[in-house]
Amino acid sequence: MTASSAKPASSVDSFFSATLAEADPEIAAAIKGELGRQRHEIELIASENIVSRAVLEAQGSVMTNKYAEGYPGARYYGGCEWVDVAENLAIDRAKKLFGANFANVQPNSGSQMNQAVFLALLQPGDTFMGLDLAAGGHLTHGSPVNMSGKWFKAAHYTVRRDDHLIDMDAVAKQAEEVKPKLIIAGGSAYSRPWDFKRFREIADHVGAYLLVDMAHFAGLVAGGAHASPVPHAHIVTTTTHKSLRGPRGGLILWNDEQFTKKLNSAIFPGLQGGPLMHVIAAKAVAFAEALRPEFKTYAKNIVENAKALAESLRAQGFDIVSGGTDNHLMLVDLRPKGLKGNVSEKALVRAGITCNKNGIPFDPEKPFVTSGLRLGTPAATTRGFGVAEFQQVGSLIAEVLNAIAQAPDGSAPLVEAAVKAKVKALTDRFPIYQ
């Protein structure tokens, strides 16, 4: 580079030293606004959480600069000695955390981790079974709008109408009839325990693989507050955020070496190129946090808080699907109140309580309307809420929903404003990122 073509030193210095606020004030303002929202609203979306400052720091590190196609010790690029350290730490910690023999920490998302299992084990057109989305399953478990439902033949099992629980005898009978190559246990809105042992017995009986997608309850498994699927499933997948409280991403676990080459090859080069090394570094940090004794207390508190919230709502006349919860989430059936999920979600958001509309089993409403709300406790538990606070949250939710049930337009501005002030007072007692 000649002297005339070189950038002035001041320009280079600015590139490496300018703060985000200096370099891009518009994005800085959006981030500041989101921080304010998280600080002053009660987060009840079951799939969200609040990560540690250490996880944020790892994810915002210079690891973002590095391409590292391949796996530790077998990369397609040079200069990977330090990202190898980070990925090996993530792998070792994941295996220790969940008691698995093998782990792949490279999936960029929950969808991609499940796609990798399909790619590794199935051929297009093969039959598999998963919980119906309307009964609490997930898009990647065979929804007709998802790749899993377009490329493969999905046979969905569901829940009973009377108690909204999975009927394992019905699952066994269906498996006998459809002879799936894969059975998936796991979902996004099922609040009761999964019988992993029985699922494996059914899978073995019909010659199917068992995949457990524990994306929602992995943090509870890690903390000993939920049964582990690892001893029973052929393959276990999970996201690394949600109740596990790490960065957004995926993880695949298995015990039998016969799956190693298939699964690793399905992720790279099958679905992904260069892994996101800054995210993998953050995953390693989160796994280390989950290995500490205090994480067991956190997981136990999530479940206790969920039970307290569900009971608080039940005591105030709200119907909880299946009658309660044994994990971190619950579904509120709004039909007895004459409410819809979309209207209720918006009213609660205006009052400073973030949640999401959700279909309930056998819901007559469309997915963007719904008859229910999904509520979860991981994020507010992270910031320190306990049983007493969640009982109060239940009362605040009831206050808003009862008010809008009496309002022709689905809004109650005075009540929403009053509840928002109470929410602000509550969240101020439990600050984040100070």
From Swiss-Prot:
It catalyses: (6R)-5,10-methylene-5,6,7,8-tetrahydrofolate + glycine + H2O = (6S)-5,6,7,8-tetrahydrofolate + L-serine. Keywords: Amino-acid biosynthesis, Cytoplasm, One-carbon metabolism, Pyridoxal phosphate, Transferase. The record marks 241 as: Plays an important role in substrate specificity. (6S)-5,6,7,8-tetrahydrofolate binds at residues 133, 137-139. InterPro entries: PyrdxlP-dep_Trfase, PyrdxlP-dep_Trfase_major, PyrdxlP-dep_Trfase_small, Ser_HO-MeTrfase, Ser_HO-MeTrfase-like, Ser_HO-MeTrfase_PLP_BS, SHMT-like_dom. Gene3D superfamilies: Aspartate Aminotransferase, domain 1, Type I PLP-dependent aspartate aminotransferase-like (Major domain). Pathway: One-carbon metabolism; tetrahydrofolate interconversion; Amino-acid biosynthesis; glycine biosynthesis; glycine from L-serine: step 1/1. The modification N6-(pyridoxal phosphate)lysine is found at residue 242. Pfam families: SHMT. It is found in: Cytoplasm. One of its GO terms (cellular component) is cytosol. Its cofactor is pyridoxal 5'-phosphate. The keyword Cytoplasm applies. Homodimer. Belongs to the SHMT family. NCBIfam families: PRK00011.1. HAMAP family: SHMT (MF_00051). This is Serine hydroxymethyltransferase. It comes from Bradyrhizobium sp. (strain BTAi1 / ATCC BAA-1182).
